């Protein structure tokens, strides 16, 4: 979502997208901020987007706390936020519950109890090529997802891994 896509949710749905990536952190008033790396997005109406997805039973959503270091206040708000999502939108299959620095989800902050779908992470250069990349390298990568999509999406669409979900930035580029 946000700057990793150039088309809105309705267009993504028409392109066949059924799995989304929701990254949040919380402001000092405990309000969720939709974000990705250093970028924050205030124009997204999260409730209307989730209500639309909740009308069907075929959507997955990874929920990630977008902080790079442990922060107890952020984690408490994240736990409350995730619990609210599960309760309010029971038809969406939520997963993740991890901090941005724990992509293995070995120690999630919130346990959605949803079996982690098998995912082909083909949406950025460092996370695809270097799963254990240092934090500074993944921050640099946040600046260039469009370039990666231009160079690799066509091949990634053409060669998906069987029985896995394909996660891409800029789904309209293929």
What label would you give each PLM region?
Residues 1-174:
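Catalytic cores of phosphodiester-bond hydrolases, prominently lipid phosphodiesterases
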């Amino acid at each position: 979502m946000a700057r990793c896509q150039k088309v809105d949710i309705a267009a993504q749905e028409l392109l066949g997208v059924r799995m989304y990536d929701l990254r949040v952190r919380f402001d000092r008033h405990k309000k969720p901020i939709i974000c990705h790396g250093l970028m924050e997005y205030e124009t997204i109406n999260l409730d209307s987007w989730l209500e639309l997805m909740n009308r069907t039973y075929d959507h997955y959503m990874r929920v990630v706390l977008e902080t790079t270091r442990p922060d107890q206040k952020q984690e408490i708000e994240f736990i409350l936020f995730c619990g609210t999502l599960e309760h309010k939108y029971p038809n969406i299959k939520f997963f993740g519950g991890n901090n941005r620095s724990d992509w293995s989800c070995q120690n999630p902050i919130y346990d959605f109890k949803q079996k982690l779908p098998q995912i082909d992470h083909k949406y950025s250069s460092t996370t695809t090529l270097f799963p254990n990349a240092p934090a500074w390298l993944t921050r640099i990568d946040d600046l260039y997802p469009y370039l990666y999509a231009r160079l690799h999406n066509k091949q990634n669409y053409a060669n998906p891994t069987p029985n896995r979900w394909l996660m891409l930035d800029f789904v309209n580029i293929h």
